[in-house]
From Swiss-Prot:
The keyword Transcription does not apply. Residues 1-69 bind DNA. Disulfide bonds: none annotated. This is SRY-related protein ADW4. Keywords: DNA-binding, Nucleus. Its main location: nucleus. SUPFAM superfamilies: HMG-box (SSF47095). Transmembrane segments: none annotated. The keyword Nucleus applies. GO terms for biological process: brain development; camera-type eye morphogenesis; negative regulation of transcription by RNA polymerase II; neuron differentiation. One of its GO terms (cellular component) is nucleus. The lineage of its organism: Eukaryota, Metazoa, Chordata, Craniata, Vertebrata. It is found in: Nucleus.
Length: 72
């Protein structure tokens, strides 16, 4: 069972597509670096929708898998 996405992962899923559309030949590592820098520059108020979505995903995950415990 996969862990639920956190706010950064929810946001980056949308943003990654935009970057890949603009620069289809860019390596994934470079895209990830850019996403990390852009996330850090976002204001907390800009992150709120993604935090709320991640919270919802976590609640759903907890309901679907009540005995889930992360084991790397």
């Amino acid at each position: 069972v996969k862990r639920p996405m956190n706010a950064f992962m929810v946001w980056s899923q949308h943003e990654r597509r935009k970057i890949m559309d603009q620069w289809p030949d860019m390596h994934n590592a470079e895209i990830s670096k850019r996403l990390g820098r852009r996330w850090e520059l976002l204001q907390d108020s800009e992150k709120i929708p993604f935090v709320k979505e991640a919270d919802g995903l976590l609640l759903k995950h907890m309901a679907d898998y009540p005995n889930y415990k992360y084991r790397p």
